[in-house]
Amino acid sequence: MTVVRDDPIRPDPGFAELYASLPDATDLWPWLELARAAAPPVLYLGIGAGRLAVPLEAAGIQLVGVDSHPGMLERLHQRLPNTELIQSRIEDLDLGRRFSMVMVPSNLLETVERLRHAAAHLAPAGLLAAELTNPYWLRAGASAGVRVQAFDGNGARFEVDYNLPDGRTVTQRAEVTLVWPDEVENWLATGAGLRLRRMFGRPDAELASSPSFYVVAGRG
């Protein structure tokens, strides 16, 4: 079994290889709808190897991409050579620019430090859109291919299996800080001075059973 880990401080080459091996996303909800409503470019934090970014660019969305993993950005640059890409952890990001939309898919914005740095890049009327791991889903035991190894309400450690097109199975080990849906409004306000505009689960699941949930927030 091949095991990889997302470590922004000590990037795992296998992690970039895994995501480069995954097929591009075909369902762009809700990111395409949100990005189309924003003035370009859209700041994409955690842009990765491009499985979502490439289809978004093909749909006409202009992106500025940030990722901490050099291997991810190297692969993405080969696919999107004209897209501005920046290597940085979210916690260290200071572009000196503001954006109409900051999007953070893939459950990366769970800490207050990351939230503050993302919010600092919002234009006055800009919106932050983020995907967060759903604690209710993890507490219920998650789903097939996901093994919850530790859960204490504030954080979780789990493994996710990916079955690749070439027949291999690669396991990603993950540790997350958890934000509960009923705490999001206060988390946004106290952490970054943001106001919750929308919160919703995936279209095929209620908020309490959705593997992740989505938050849209802005100032004022």
Model-inferred region functions:
Residues 1-48:
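Conserved class I S-adenosyl-L-methionine
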Residues 92-101:
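A short acidic, Gly/Pro-enriched loop at the edge of an enzyme's catalytic core
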Residues 49-92:
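Class I SAM-dependent methyltransferase SAM/SAH-binding core
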Residues 110-118:
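A short, conserved alpha-helix within the catalytic core of class I
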Residues 105-106:
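Residues lining the SAM
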